[in-house]
Amino acid sequence: MKKLNIKRAFKALVRNGEGTIYWQAFNNGNYLVGNAHCVITVSESDFHDNFDVINTNKVRLVNSECLLDVARKCAEHLETEYMKPTTVSIMVGSTDTQVLKTSRTKRLTVVNKEYMQCLEDAGSTMLYVSKQKTSIKEPLFEMLTDEKQELVKFFCVLPIHCDVENVLGDVLSKNIL
């Protein structure tokens, strides 16, 4: 399998009625090898269009069905076409998000100007939100009411199967979204 540098992200603009979604792919380390993560990075403007910030560490879902639908369509397509285990996650933040470090616990820490998301923890993907770069807040879904928890779990954790080398190019070229 061809190794792809972590900085070489596959990006495409997907108009879905709610805004623009950028595609990226990366794994724990400098290259994409074997299992990987396909991360939907939502732009900062789309974040404010679809989410309502209550305070520094609590976020309420607003009109998230559109973003969720995009992830679902992608997962359905990839699960049919490919056979390698991976995970699709949704990460909210600005488009200039940078990967800062990968800890020994294999937790991928992603930080941008305002928000911090920690993704990928032993096969389970969580979404964390914080305005403090030095602290990790509680998982988002634990802050919501019971009726919202299942939605957020699916919104943040989406296991599928795909071929790391070709998945993004195929999805975008076929314009399945």
PLM regions and their residue ranges:
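DNA polymerase processivity clamps
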Residues: 1-177
